[in-house]
């Protein structure tokens, strides 16, 4: 429950940056992950099956967010490899948060709410 609260707190904090292309890409990716989570909970998928699915989910949204993160990091002076590493870490953090939420919600049928 604490991890779910943390994920939502981060999402709410980031939601204040409306109109920002990076935030829009992040939100699109996050909402796609949430849809995958909710569908998996409804379908009563197991944890290993969900983990396999979520690692590959939302390829278009993931790539868009990745590209924007890399561009932003390079704008701060990061080298390509550093920027890509950072982008991959940020994306994996979102996936891990969704996976953690699934672990909490799978047995109770709990659903996540998409960001507006």
Language model features: what each stretch is:
Residues 1-16:
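Classic N-terminal secretory signal peptides
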Residues 12-13, 38, 74:
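General secondary-structure edge motif
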Residues 22-68:
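Short N-proximal segments of mature Sec-exported proteins
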Residues 51-116:
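Compact alpha-helical subdomains of small soluble proteins
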């Amino acid at each position: 429950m604490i991890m779910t609260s943390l994920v939502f707190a981060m999402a709410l904090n980031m939601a204040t940056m409306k109109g920002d292309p990076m935030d829009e890409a992040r939100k699109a990716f996050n909402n796609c992950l949430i849809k995958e989570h909710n569908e998996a909970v409804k379908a009563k998928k197991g944890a290993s099956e969900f983990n396999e699915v979520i690692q590959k989910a939302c390829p278009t949204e993931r790539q868009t967010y990745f590209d924007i993160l890399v561009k932003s990091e390079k704008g701060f002076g990061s080298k390509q490899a550093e920027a890509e590493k950072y982008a991959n870490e940020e994306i994996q953090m979102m996936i891990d948060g969704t996976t953690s939420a699934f672990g909490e919600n799978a047995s109770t049928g709990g659903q996540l709410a998409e960001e507006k």
